A protein has these predicted regions:
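Phosphodiester-processing cores and adjacent nucleic acid-binding clamps
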Residues: 3-197
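A short, hydrophobic C-terminal helix/tail in secreted or cell-surface proteins
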Residues: 198-204
Length: 204
């Protein structure tokens, strides 16, 4: 399917630490996908953060040129820096260019109480500890999979953004299993229990 192909290409062809798909590849899919401007890690967010309106306008125009009505702007409320200011700056551009804004959540974990587990993984990746006073905290406990009701309550002052999001959902067909775990398999010698895997850690 298109989703699997995009994800595979993003992982296999990226020269960055995170999966990336280039703009030309996106253009090839213009008739099959809805393009959303992106959140805090997007070029648009960075341009408006620097108050570079002309660059932000150029980015928007480059997407609408190819995706037409299937390009929308995106705002989030995850209690992270600069989100409020970004919302204020993106509104005039949306009105000027006649582009809908959708409300999304930058989801990184399933439940709100998974936040500490996520932060632990981040610390492992960055060689930091949870109680390190100098550790940069770039994620929020609000980045969990919220229900429709929670999102509606979060954006109750601008419910049209939720309505725009619902319109996109009508164009998409997505399903995933939340009950099954997909974890790597580690070989264990015969006649040895899985506690064998903890031995190297205990020795260290």
């Amino acid at each position: 399917c298109i989703r699997d192909r995009v994800i595979s290409n993003a992982h296999n062809n990226s020269t960055y630490t995170s999966p990336v798909i280039n703009f030309n590849e996106l253009i090839e899919l213009k008739n099959d996908i809805v393009a959303i401007s992106g959140g805090k890690d997007s070029h648009l967010f960075e341009s408006l953060k620097r108050n570079n309106i002309s660059d932000a306008s150029r980015i928007i125009d480059s997407f609408t040129k190819y995706f037409k009505d299937d390009f929308v702007l995106e705002v989030q409320r995850t209690n992270r820096p600069d989100e409020v200011e970004y919302f204020k700056n993106i509104l005039p551009l949306a009105v000027e260019k006649g582009i809908p804004i959708v409300a999304t959540n930058d989801v990184l974990f399933a439940n709100q109480d998974d936040y500490e587990v996520h932060e632990t993984k981040v610390c492992i990746n960055t060689s930091k500890t949870l109680n390190d006073p100098n550790r940069e905290k770039i994620f929020s406990e609000q980045q969990y999979f919220k229900s429709s009701e929670q999102m509606e309550n979060l954006f109750k002052d601008c419910i049209s953004l939720i309505e725009n999001t619902n319109e996109i959902s009508k164009k998409c067909n997505v399903s995933f299993d939340t009950k099954e775990y997909f974890l790597p398999e580690y070989p264990v010698p015969k006649a040895v229990s899985y506690t064998h895997l903890t031995l190297p850690t205990n020795k260290a």
